[in-house]
Amino acid sequence: KVDFFGVGNENWGCGGNMNPDFYANEYRRYQTYVRDYKAGEHVEKICCGANVDDYEWTKEVLATCFNHSQPFQHGFMDGLSLHYYVHPEGWDIKGSATDFDENVWYKTLNKALYMEELIKRHGVIMDEYDPEKKIGMIVDEWGTWYTCEPGTNPGFLYQQNTMRDALVAGITLNIFNKHSDRVKMANLAQMVNVLQSVLLTEGDKMVKTPTYHVFNMYKYHQDATLVESSIETETIGTQEEYQVPNLTESVSVDENGVLHLTITNLSVSESYEVDAAILDREIKEVKGEIVTEEMHAKNTFEEADKVCVKEFSDVQITEKGLKFTIPACSVLHVTVK
């Protein structure tokens, strides 16, 4: 059973080097034959969207797909994709997955935060054609992309995974949560052994990466309802060009009424006190779990649990909500009942 069908991939580049109008007409033709063959089991059709900030692609593809179509067809698509990778040092050099300094740490996180601008600006164009948000933005390739590990096949794109990747994951997932009215799906490009993977394998050995543990904490947001939230931040960083906020967050409530707060601390060295006000809720129980280590920490086949989820008990219930201190270089999940 196929739930989602992508009609082409990266057609602006390796998928045909097409211009947007040509691709959109090809999409209209071929999507015709992606049919539902069973009542109640809709195959969602995903149109190839832009690479990074190619807003012209988004505009022209939607214009062509919506031309001479009926409103109920919403451009003959259920989703429009977006691809964005974080290359700390640029496309040609990219940079090491494990050997980096504080400048590169903040540069990487600054580039991860760019995802929000991409979602907003592509979203504005989508709103012109699809104000009811019938079409999901599908961020189906994202994550960090470094120079592959020394001694490995360059074509396999094998890279290690550190606390830096854990922060990129937490930052990005918080952004997706906050824009879940438009972002309906998002996918790390590869799950195992490639780029920002969640698992690394070698023969019969397997290790969970720091990214895996962040995803494991964030799973409680899935199928939950977004809760409006904001946080006071300060700007940090080592270079003027690559400043970042010290904290990011997102909040949801699940079907059982349990509140889930996820917060990232982007600082390499500073912890911060968070005094959270929670409205319309009498707090009875609080639990916390955290992924935190120094910025270069990673899991290896020799030391598989260097970075993992640990209990976080430093959460106080206050009259207005919660108070806690989030350690440097960490991703925190707090459950509130």
Per-segment meaning from a language model:
Residues 8-15, 52-57, 86-91, 143-149, ...:
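Flexible loop/turn segments at secondary-structure boundaries
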Residues 5, 30, 80, 122, ...:
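Conserved, mostly hydrophobic/aromatic
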Residues 2-6, 11-23, 27, 45:
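Aromatic-lined, polymer-binding surfaces characteristic
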Residues 230-235, 239-244, 264-337:
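C-terminal beta-sandwich/jelly-roll accessory domains of carbohydrate-active enzymes
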Residues 18, 34, 68-70, 124-129, ...:
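Generic recognition of flexible, low-complexity loop/linker segments
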